[in-house]
Amino acid sequence: MRLSIRAIVLFALVWIGLLMSGYGVLVGSKVNAAGLVLQCHYLTARGTSTAQYLHTNSGIIGFSDCPIFRKIATVVDNG
C-alpha cells in the first residue's frame, strides 16, 4: 500500500515538473527517409511531441541519437 502511494506521489511530482518546465522526455525514435531523417517522440505533461533532425552516424553534421530531454514551445509558467 505504501509503495503504491509513493509511486503515485512520485508520478505526480514528475508530471508537475514537466508541466512547469516545458520539457519532454524521449519515449521513442526512428530513422526514416532513407536514413537521412531522425524522428524523435517526446512525452510531455500535455501529450506527445515529435521532432525531426538530420541524421548522420558520426553526429558531426546532424544528430546520431535523439536528445533525452527537449524543450517544448508551450510552457504553463513563464515566470
Swiss-Prot record:
Residues 1-33 form the signal peptide. InterPro entries: YobH. Keywords: Signal. The keyword Signal applies. It holds the Pfam family YobH. This is Uncharacterized protein YobH. It comes from Salmonella paratyphi A (strain ATCC 9150 / SARB42). The lineage of its organism: Bacteria, Pseudomonadati, Pseudomonadota, Gammaproteobacteria, Enterobacterales.
